[in-house]
C-alpha cells in the first residue's frame, strides 16, 4: 500500500448558529464522516446537528508538478437532528442517507429533502420509551430496509417501509458501536467487550472481553472483526480513590476476531495507540489503523511485518477562528475508506476534513469513490427568455434560434458510411470468403460451383421479407410448456385453428433434412441448437419436441462445458462391445480418496473418464427419450491434466473456432478418449480387452539403398485409431487410369474432375495403411550420397475401427465431388506372412479369409458459414441402430434416410470421425442393468452403501448424525428412501439485458452437489434414521455457498480446513447409483431439481415427490416444504439454515400424510384447504 498522499483539505463546517446559550459560540467540530456507496459524495456531520455533502470538482496541479490536488464543491447542507444535538453517525442507503443523533434518526434523500424523521414520539409501540440515548445504527444482516439501533438501554429494530413499529431485541443495551456480518450483529459494548448477537434467534452467541476500559472503534470485513479501545490505567495508590473516576490509556493493540472459529486471532501491535481502524474494502487482509496524533499504518493481518507508515499533517493551513484552539494539540478523528478503496478521509480538531488517495505513478487522479457511480442530480437550469425580437425573413439564418440542451447525437449527425434502408430491409449477403481467397490468384473467371450455390440463372418465386421473417420466427424454438398449456385452455376459432396448423407445419421445418436446390440454405435439422429458459427454468423447455424416436433414444444437452464431445459419445454409445465394456466396469469399485488424488493430481471428484463414461451410458439407457446432461463427465474431463495439455478444453461453445480448428478438436478428443479408457481399464481392473477391441497393429521397416549401407531396422507397434490420409494427385491419377482405361493420357490431363466417379473410402484406406517414403541417410552421407527407404504397413485391423478424417478444406472439396465416397461396408482380406491388407467393396468366391466391416456411424462437421468464420460450426453424428439411421444433433434426435447419410456432395458437410465395426460384433446384445437382477450380478461390489469412505484424513471431532446400514437392512426393490440434496453455486448465471430492462436467461447458474442425506423410510423402529449424510469435497472456487438455502458455510467443503468428514463426488454418486439400480423408491421434495443437479436419471415409478403430490394445477404454484410442514404437520422447519436431514425427514412425513389422506378419501379437500390457507398467508409461514 505504498504511494498514498494527501490531495485535499476541506473546511467542512460553517459558523455556528446564533443562540442564547453561551457555549453556542464555540466552533463546530466534525463528528461523523461517510463515503457514499451510490454517488460521488462525502457526507459530513457536525456538532450542531447539520449534515453536509461534498462532490469532487476539477483537478489542479500544485507547486510540485508531480503532486496533484482535487478540489471539492459543496452539494447539500441540511439540519438532521433535534435541538442542535451532534450527528453521531451516518448510514448510506440506496434511497438516501440516514443521520443519527442521541434522540432521533433522520432519513433524507441525497438532495437533502426529508423522507423520514423518527423520535420516541414516532412509534406506537410500548418500546418507544427505549428510543433515547442512541449511540449507533446499522442495517440488519443481508437486508437494506431493516435498521438496527444500539443505545444505552436496549437493542432496537425498525423497518424503513413501516417506521411506526419499533421492535426490541432481548438485550440489556450498554452499546457503543453496532455493525453486522452476514449472519450476526457485532455489538461493541461500553465496557470494551465485543458481543456477537443473532437477530434470528434473538440471543447472544458469543462475547469477547477485548478491552478493559472503553471501545473506540469497530469494523467488520467478511468473517473478520477489528476493534480498538482503551484500558483502565492501573494506580499505585488507590486507597483514597474509590469514588474517583478511572483513568484510561489507549491500547497499543488492535484486536482481530474470526467469527468462523469464534475466537480471537493474533492482534496487531500499534505502539502509537489505536483510535480508529478500518478494513480495506477490496483487500480484506489489509487494515488501516490511525492514532489521535495522526499516525497512519497499513498492516497485513496475515503478515504483520508488512507495514506502510504515514504521518498526517494536522496543523491548520490558516489561522483558527477561535484563539482557544491554538492552545490545544491537534488530534485526528473519524477515519473512513471509500467503497472502491481508492480514497480515505479523516477529520481533525480544527474541523477540517483531509482526503488521501493512492497515486504512486503520477497519473491523473480519479474522481470516483465507487466503481460505477450514479450521476448526481443537478438543479434545473432556467434559460431566461429572449428580449430581442427575431424576425423571420430571407436575411435571418435559421441557426439564430438556438437548439435545446441535449445529450445524445442528433439524427443529422450520422456517419457518412451509414446507409438507411426501408423497414424490413437487410444488408446484402457477404461475399463468400473462399472466393475472396481465390481472387488473390489473379484469375479472371472462376468455375461456378453448382453443388455449393445451387443452379444458376433460375427464377425464384417472389416472397416478401415479412413472410420470410414470419417463417423463420416459427422455425427457431417451440413454445414453452407453460405457454403451450395456456394456449390449449383457450377456445380457438376456425381462423385460429388454421393458423395453428400453419404454425405446426412451419415448426416441422426444424426436422427438414433436405431443402430444394433453389434455396442455398443448410437444412434446419443441422442448425446449432440453444436451450431457452423461461421464468420456470429449464424444466419449462420442451425437449420432447426435438426427439422423434418414439421413446427409444435420448439426446444430450449442450449447455455444459465441452459439449462439443456430444456427437462422439452418442456414436460410441451404440457400439455394443464398447458400450458393454464401459458399463460392466461399473460393477467394480474404484473410489480413490487420498490427498494425492484430490489435491496433487487435481481430481477432487475422485473419478475417471472410464467411470464417468460408464455412468453416462447407463443414464442414457435409463432416460429412454428424455434429455441427459453430461456435466459430471465434463467436470472430470476438464480437470484431466492430459486434456489440459492437449488443449482439448473448450468453455465457450466453440465461439473462437473455425472449421479446421473444430475438426482438430474433436479428433484430438477421440484419441484422448480411447487412450484414457485404455489407461483407466489397466489401472482400475487390469483389463486389456479394449486393446483387442480397438488396437491397430503396424510394422515399420527402414532399409538402406546403398550397396554397402548396413542400416536395416524393423519395428512393430500399435495404435488405437487410424488417421486417414489423402492420396497425392499422382496416385489418384494412376488409379483413375487403371479403373478407367478409356482415358487417353496423351490427349487429356487427368484431373480431379476425371476421377470423381472412380474413388471412394477404400482408395484412401489402401493408401493410408501402406506408406512408403525415402529420406537421406545421415549416417553414411559423408561416404557417398544415398537414401533410406521407410515403409510402414498396417498388419492387423481391430474389430472396432475408428478412422480420423483429418483433412484440409481443399481435400474435403475433392471428397464432395466423389459421388459414393463413403461406403456402407467393405471387406478386409486377412494377410499372411506380413503381407499388406487388401480391401474390396464386395466379396468374390476366391476371397474366403476376410472380415466384413459395416459402418456404425460417423461424426460430421456442419459449416453454417465460411470455413474461416469463427463460432459458426457445429458437430452432429449419424448412427445406425437396428437397421435404421438416426441423426443426433445434441438433443435433437430423428430418423433420417440412408441416402442422405451417404450424400457428401454438400460443401457444408464434412465427415470427421468414421467408425466401422466387424459384422461379428455388431449384433452383440447390449448389457442393460435390470433392477430385478441387479443385486445378483456377478462381481458386483456394493460395499460403499454399508461403510464410510472419507476423503483424506478423518475428523474424529465431527459428530455423526447418521447410522450406517447393515447387511440385514440391505435395500431391495420398493424400499423407501427419503433423500435431500444441497448444492453450491460454482458459476453465476448469464443474463442478456435488453434496452427496455427486460432480462433473458442465457445460461443458468451451475450448481454442484455439496451435501446429500438419505434416511430410512420404511415403517419400523429406525424409520427416519439417516444412513447417509455426506459432505462433498470441493477444491475449486465456489461462487456462492447459498448458505441460507444449503446450510453450507465457507470452509465446510475445503479438504484441508473443514471440520467435517468429506467424501468425493463419485462416492456419493455411486451410493445413489447403487440404490437406484437396486430398485429403491426415493421420497423427497422437489426431486426433479435434485436429480438434475446430481445427473441421475430415475424412472418415474421410483420417485415419490411431495412437491407434485401437493400441487394444484389451477393455481400454477408449487408449495414449499416449509409451508406444507406448517399447514399439514403443524411444525416449523427451516427456521435457520437448511438441514438436509431435517428436510428429508419432513418430506417423508408429508408422504406418509399423503398416503393417509388418500386412503381416507380426503385428498381433494385437504389440497383445497392447503391452498386456501396459502392465499390467506400469502404462502408464507408467519414468524
From Swiss-Prot:
The keyword Cell inner membrane does not apply. Its EC number is 3.1.13.4. Residues 977-1151 form the Exonuclease domain. The keyword Repeat applies. It is an enzyme of class 3 (hydrolase). A divalent metal cation binds at residues 980, 982, 1090, 1143. Residues 521-919 form the USP domain. WD repeats lie at residues 159-207, 269-309, 327-366. Residues 369-520 are annotated as: Linker. Its cofactor is a divalent metal cation. One of its GO terms (biological process) is mRNA processing. GO terms for molecular function: metal ion binding; nucleic acid binding; poly(A)-specific ribonuclease activity. Binds 2 metal cations per subunit in the catalytic exonuclease domain. Positively regulated by the regulatory subunit PAN3. Catalytic subunit of the poly(A)-nuclease (PAN) deadenylation complex, one of two cytoplasmic mRNA deadenylases involved in mRNA turnover. PAN specifically shortens poly(A) tails of RNA and the activity is stimulated by poly(A)-binding protein PAB1. PAN deadenylation is followed by rapid degradation of the shortened mRNA tails by the CCR4-NOT complex. Deadenylated mRNAs are then degraded by two alternative mechanisms, namely exosome-mediated 3'-5' exonucleolytic degradation, or deadenylation-dependent mRNA decaping and subsequent 5'-3' exonucleolytic degradation by XRN1. This is PAN2-PAN3 deadenylation complex catalytic subunit PAN2.
